[in-house]
């Protein structure tokens, strides 16, 4: 798994979730423009095996989670328009693990999601006004256990 460290000027918010899995970090130089969410089951079920692919160009990509035994059967591609300013969703237990079960991304122009089951404990990563999310970090293994955001001034 690729590991990229955030620039020293970036602030962090989060992570939310549990401490299972291994740490990952994605802080591209270019703006985020696409997030691919992969699920096992249908998109209205849980993100029990979510695989999140963040990208800012064809060569600056990281995929986290989704390495468990269930096949990934559904993919949702989110083409980001604007600056991401908030991440929210649900954390809930799945097979004994507290994991990210649904997720929503909000930009200064629109909302994307929520994707996954609307059940569990809500979480919200909202950054201070005048800033934008420029990268993500967290823990993952079979599941996306935790997620946080790097942010900087617009």
Curated annotation (Swiss-Prot):
Tissue expression notes: Expressed in leaves (at protein level). Expressed in leaves and to a lesser extent in petioles. Not expressed in stems or tuberous roots.
Regulation: Hemagglutinating activity is completely inhibited by methyl alpha-D-glucopyranoside or methyl alpha-D-mannopyranoside. The activity is also inhibited by maltose, glucose, galactose, mannose and lactose, but not by polygalacturonic acid, mannitol, sorbitol or sucrose.
SUPFAM superfamilies named among the record's database cross-references: Mannose-binding lectins
Domain Jacalin-type lectin: 10-153
Residues that bind a carbohydrate: 21, 97, 141-145
Keyword tags: Lectin
SMART domains in the record: Jacalin (SM00915)
GO terms of biological process kind: defense response to insect; positive regulation of stress-activated MAPK cascade; protein homotetramerization; response to wounding
Keyword Flavoprotein: no
Post-translational modification summary for this protein: The N-terminus is blocked.
GO MF term list: carbohydrate binding
InterPro entries (UniProt xref): Jacalin-like_lectin_dom, Jacalin-like_lectin_dom_plant, Jacalin-like_lectin_dom_sf
Region (Involved in regulating the binding affinity to carbohydrates) location: 1-10
Pfam name, any one: Jacalin
Induction: By wounding of the leaves (at protein level). Expressed in unwounded leaves on day 7, indicating factors in senescence may up-regulate the expression (at protein level). By plant hormone methyl jasmonate (MJ) in leaves and to a lesser extent in petioles, but not in stems or roots (at protein level). In leaves, both local and systemic expression is induced by mechanical wounding. Increased expression is detected in wounded local leaves after 6 hours, but expression decreases at 12 hours after wounding.
Coiled coil: none
Entry function: Lectin involved in defense reactions of the leaves in response to wounding by herbivorous insects and pathogens. Retards the growth and development of silkworm thus reducing their survival rates. Has hemagglutinating activity against human erythrocytes.
Subunit structure: Homotetramer.
Family the UniProt entry places it in: Belongs to the jacalin lectin family.
Protein name from the UniProt record: Ipomoelin
Naturally occurring in which organism (per UniProt): Ipomoea batatas (Sweet potato)
